[in-house]
């Protein structure tokens, strides 16, 4: 009975939001090319390795805060820059679950100007590893394209964790620009900028592809974090994982 009621409720919600925003359709390659500007950035003189930065005008972003993020222009879900995960890997945009469920929230925030979008579902909301290896490298890609403070807003997976605020401080960004994606799941932007993910590949496991993360990005992050004045050396370092939501990879301090 409860399952049937939930199913009916979801159908009603979807129909209502389809009336408001239109039924979502997967965009064609032609629509994508006509509406998405693509720029390339490089981290070194090695022109064999580049990263795309995607720019879209007048669009929406909706996240289910799980495994799907939809970047929507008019009523079209844009492939390549929307995110859909399955079995710990990036899958084809046609499998984005938001195509089925629709956007289940009204627009929570409208932003005038250019929004840098870094959200990617649940993976980086609380997970330190995904934050360090996914979100910060995407910030580095965006920084190669444009001064981060030139963006009018920066849409992040979460800004509640201390490690998130601490690591962002090394980029010198005005915190007033931050939008908390864990609370604000549906936005409209006059202009949206999305940097390419540093290592995700379609139908490739994340644990396999993370080994291919660009050494130039790692070195750039290392330079940012190590550029600290008057650091006192310590014989030992205490690492605390007690606030982690994950019970694997725990550390014993001696």
Regions found by a protein language model. Name each.
Residues 1-254:
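The feature primarily captures lumenal catalytic ectodomains
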């Amino acid at each position: 009975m409860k399952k049937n009621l939930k199913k009916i409720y979801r159908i009603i919600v979807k129909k209502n939001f389809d009336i408001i925003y239109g039924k979502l359709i997967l965009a064609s390659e032609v629509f994508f090319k006509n509406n998405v500007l693509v720029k390339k950035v490089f981290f070194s003189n090695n022109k064999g390795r580049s990263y795309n930065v995607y720019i879209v005008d007048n669009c929406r972003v909706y996240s289910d805060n799980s495994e799907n993020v939809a970047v929507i222009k008019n009523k079209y879900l844009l492939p390549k820059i929307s995110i859909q995960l399955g079995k710990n890997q990036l899958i084809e945009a046609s499998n984005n679950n938001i195509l089925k469920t629709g956007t289940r929230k009204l627009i929570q925030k409208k932003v005038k100007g250019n929004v840098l979008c870094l959200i990617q579902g649940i993976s980086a909301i609380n997970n330190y590893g995904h934050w360090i290896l996914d979100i910060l490298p995407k910030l580095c890609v965006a920084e190669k394209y444009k001064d981060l403070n030139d963006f009018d807003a920066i849409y992040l997976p979460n800004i509640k964790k201390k490690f998130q605020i601490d690591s962002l401080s090394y980029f010198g960004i005005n915190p007033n620009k931050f939008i908390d994606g864990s609370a604000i799941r549906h936005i409209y932007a006059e202009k949206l900028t999305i940097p390419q993910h540093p290592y995700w590949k379609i139908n490739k496991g994340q644990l396999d592809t993370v080994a291919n993360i660009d050494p130039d990005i790692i070195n750039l992050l290392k330079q940012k974090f190590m550029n600290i004045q008057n650091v006192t050396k310590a014989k030992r370092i205490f690492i605390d994982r007690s606030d982690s939501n994950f019970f694997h990879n725990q550390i014993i301090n001696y």
